[in-house]
């Protein structure tokens, strides 16, 4: 068999379903590169969702799973390197089986506009309105939610 090349990318993995007891906690971390672990040590499992998982497992008294749905460059309002956080919410949170909680950590890339078009400039008011309006519509069907600011 030929020797393969190591990579730190997940080219083909789009999800993993597991059987879990009915009382299990299922947490989705929806965010940008800070959630994805862009500056974390590769394969060290030190990203904040990894650390959260360890703490929850130690304290919850029941099975816990934390799904890291961080996407580098992701923004709240506008698509870049994939759908915006608001557009991803349905498929990356609501469509996932067994989710009981969601943590949303988005916003660092919206005001920076490095990759954006001039018409996609946003203010803090735009971001707050986007999260408030978008999540008000989506959260009525969602699990318990926690919104985190990246600032």
Region locations from a protein language model:
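N-terminal secretory targeting modules
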Residues: 1-30, 35-44, 58-61
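Active-site metal-binding loops of divalent metal-dependent hydrolases
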Residues: 32-34, 71, 108
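General small-molecule cofactor/ligand-binding pocket signal
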Residues: 67-69
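Alpha-helical cap/lid subdomain in secreted, periplasmic
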Residues: 43, 50, 54-62, 74, ...
């Amino acid at each position: 068999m030929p020797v393969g090349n190591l990579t730190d990318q997940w080219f083909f993995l789009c999800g993993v379903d597991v059987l879990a007891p009915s009382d299990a906690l299922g947490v989705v971390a929806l965010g940008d590169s800070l959630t994805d672990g862009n500056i974390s040590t590769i394969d060290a499992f030190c990203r904040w969702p990894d650390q959260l998982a360890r703490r929850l497992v130690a304290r919850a008294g029941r099975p816990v799973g934390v799904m890291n749905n961080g996407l580098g460059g992701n923004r709240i309002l506008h698509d870049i390197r994939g759908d915006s956080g608001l557009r991803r919410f349905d498929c990356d949170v609501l469509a996932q089986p067994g989710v009981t909680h969601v943590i949303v950590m988005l916003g660092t890339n919206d005001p920076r506009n490095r990759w954006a078009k001039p018409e996609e400039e946003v203010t803090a008011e735009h971001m707050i309105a986007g999260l408030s309006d978008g999540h008000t519509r989506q959260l009525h069907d969602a699990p318990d939610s926690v919104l985190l600011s990246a600032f």
